[in-house]
């Protein structure tokens, strides 16, 4: 994951996970 999805996942999971993003270092990234 190298492209940030503009969402953090410190308190809640990535909502952008439906678009293929995943949590890494408290930030959502697109793999």
Curated annotation (Swiss-Prot):
Belongs to the cyclotide family. Bracelet subfamily. There is a cross-link at residues 1-31 (Cyclopeptide (Gly-Asp)). GO terms for biological process: cytolysis in another organism; defense response. Keywords: Disulfide bond, Knottin, Plant defense. This is a cyclic peptide. The keyword Disulfide bond applies. Disulfide bonds join 5-21, 9-23, 14-28. Detected in seeds (at protein level). Probably participates in a plant defense mechanism. The presence of a 'disulfide through disulfide knot' structurally defines this protein as a knottin. This is Cyclotide hyen-J. It comes from the Eukaryota. PROSITE patterns: CYCLOTIDE (PS51052), CYCLOTIDE_BRACELET (PS60008). The keyword Disulfide bond applies. The lineage of its organism: Eukaryota, Viridiplantae, Streptophyta, Embryophyta, Tracheophyta. Coiled coil: none annotated.
């Amino acid at each position: 994951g190298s492209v940030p999805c503009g969402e953090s996942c410190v308190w809640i999971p990535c909502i952008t996970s439906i678009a293929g993003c995943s949590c890494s270092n408290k930030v959502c990234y697109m793999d």
